[in-house]
Amino acid sequence: MNEYKPTIGISMGDPASIGPEVTIKAVATEKVRRICRPIVVGDANVLQKTIEITGLNLDINKISKVNEALFAKGIVDVFDMQNVDIKKHEMGKVSAEYGNAAFENVVKVIDLAMKNEIEATVTGPIHKESINLAGHKFSGHTEIYAEYTNTNKYAMLLVEENLRVIHVSTHVSLRQACDLVKKDRIIETIELIDEACRRIGIENPKIGVAGLNPHSSDGGLFGYEEEKEIIPAIREALKRGYDVEGPIPSDTLFPKAIGGVYDGCVVMYHDQGHIPFKVVGFNWDKKKQKMKSVRGVNITLGLPIIRTSVDHGTAMEIAGQNIASEDAMILAIEYAVKLNNTKSLKKEGL
């Protein structure tokens, strides 16, 4: 009897980036094949070129329908978008053509999931400048998913080993982020990370909430957001039965979370969460002056479908050199499978 394995759609990311490389390397592994049935969404010619660069012994099966996939060893099933002119294809190039291709790949993988043709989605890195050059005015994957799934309440969760970070706001200016520190928004974010932790196997998650200002304002010396918005949100969350503490200064919250005191961290803005997260998940090779390995997964919460992603960028400077690490892509696929397998724990949205 064959063991059930979910079908996972993987958008390859920007065709000029390391996205195709990390995608091909990941789906070629036994680790990925053992847990799911992957379908790559992207341009088949770019992926064929990538296979040749990596030297992997793989063949491409071009498909236009999910039921045409073979899911066989040595075969990469590719939902061929035919959206890149391979004769003019250049690695590391920022362009409207590649931005449009990346955008189309993402929209297609969303469409397949919304139609229940695949069980989860994983995304490779896109270049925000290229996307916008193509006329698609989105600040990132998260906003594209929200638009094409008609989702109003959503959040970004970063996961790396025992560090789990969720943001009250993400792709807005720092000035706007301060304005978004509101009681109701913080409560919603606490609820989202509590549910997400339970879905990845943490039965009674303990949540730490960061302050916004230095030292969490030290009783109002450095700002009012803690007293007016964050503390009331925490009190309300406690009333609702959530195990939550705060506000905690970031430089205290993260060492404790890494040490296992907190199962999840709620932060107020993008860099407050991304900087410590990437310090933990990214490994810089001092001798070679390049990233040695990159781990970490981005999970979009609140969507009607599952979406995980690598938490690294396009790395245009090393695209096409066969030196990009597939670790984060493998981890993203593993989390997509894990979330799919715990759908019964889902309340509303992921």
Annotated model-derived regions:
Residues 1-141, 184-208, 212-268, 272-297, ...:
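Contiguous, glycine/small-aliphatic-enriched amphipathic segments in soluble metabolic enzymes
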